[in-house]
């Protein structure tokens, strides 16, 4: 029986990744390096013989443009795609736009690590009159006030990502379609925690590098049997370590 595969990709480096700022739902674009990473991810997938029947991404352009670049390399720019806010990055509340290292200098490395990677820890909330509140953005006009976050923990991110997985993505995989998901560090961490049944301590230490394809293989019951990155292992480990170090004081 053929192995069922799923490809997950965190967006390439964004302009605010480059500036080491908390991004969350702020709609910042890819940096030049990020576009290069996305094209390289597409080339890797092409060289490994991947092709897709359907794509999912968020409503934030750093993920959308990553997907565009990947599909362009695969000559699949036409691929049917669904965009959902449920695949957005976690909302970083009042931290959005702040420099991570400067925030660590102010509050300490451990507090920032908990805000960035803790399971149930929420960053300080936005107020609804803050220009960063998603209720001011027309792309979220169909959401209820209860669905619009003022801040999110990873646990709250899981609460929106996993129902979307169960109701939208998994049924498509079960039907035999080959699926790629281009999303964000924390929406993908939410999915990895669920698929691999990771503990809160394990997920705290999981950092997903930008622009690197992460492949899941499933058994006939659609349970994960293997998870691996495509690319040079040393380079990927260095990129993941760099992600972890973003939240430390200089």
From Swiss-Prot:
InterPro entries: His_Pase_superF_clade-1 (IPR013078), His_PPase_superfam (IPR029033), PG/BPGM_mutase_AS (IPR001345), Phosphogly_mut1 (IPR005952). Gene3D superfamilies: Phosphoglycerate mutase-like. It comes from Serratia proteamaculans (strain 568). The record marks 184 as: Transition state stabilizer. CDD domains: HP_PGM_like (cd07067). The active site is at 11 (tele-phosphohistidine intermediate), 89 (proton donor/acceptor). This is 2,3-bisphosphoglycerate-dependent phosphoglycerate mutase. Its EC number is 5.4.2.11. The keyword Transport does not apply. The lineage of its organism: Bacteria, Pseudomonadati, Pseudomonadota, Gammaproteobacteria, Enterobacterales. HAMAP family: PGAM_GpmA (MF_01039). Catalyzes the interconversion of 2-phosphoglycerate and 3-phosphoglycerate. NCBIfam families: pgm_1 (TIGR01258), PRK14115.1 (NF010713). The keyword ATP-binding does not apply. Pathway: Carbohydrate degradation; glycolysis; pyruvate from D-glyceraldehyde 3-phosphate: step 3/5. GO terms for biological process: gluconeogenesis; glycolytic process. It is an enzyme of class 5 (isomerase).
């Amino acid at each position: 029986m053929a192995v069922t595969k799923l490809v997950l990709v965190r967006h390439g480096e964004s302009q605010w990744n480059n500036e080491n700022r908390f991004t969350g739902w702020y709609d910042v674009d890819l940096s030049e390096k990020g576009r290069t990473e996305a094209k390289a991810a597409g080339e890797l997938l092409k060289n490994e013989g991947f092709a897709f029947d359907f794509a999912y991404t968020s409503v934030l352009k750093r993920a959308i443009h990553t997907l565009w670049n990947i599909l362009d390399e695969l000559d699949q720019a036409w691929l049917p795609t669904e965009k959902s806010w449920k695949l957005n990055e976690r909302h970083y509340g009042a931290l959005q736009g702040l420099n991570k290292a400067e925030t660590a200098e102010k509050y300490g490395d451990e507090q920032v690590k908990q805000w960035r990677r803790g399971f149930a820890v929420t960053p300080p909330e936005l107020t609804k009159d803050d220009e960063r509140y998603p209720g001011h953005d027309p792309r979220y006009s169909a959401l209820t006030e209860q669905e619009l976050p003022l801040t999110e923990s990873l646990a709250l991110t899981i609460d929106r990502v996993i129902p979307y997985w169960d109701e939208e993505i998994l049924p498509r995989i079960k039907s035999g379609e080959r699926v790629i998901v281009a999303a964000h560090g924390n929406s993908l961490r939410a999915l990895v925690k669920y698929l691999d049944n990771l503990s809160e301590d394990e997920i705290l230490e999981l950092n997903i590098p930008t622009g690197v394809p992460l492949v899941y293989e499933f058994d006939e019951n659609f349970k994960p049997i293997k998870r691996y990155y495509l690319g040079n292992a040393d380079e990927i480990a260095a990129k993941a370590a760099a992600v972890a170090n973003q939240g430390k004081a200089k």
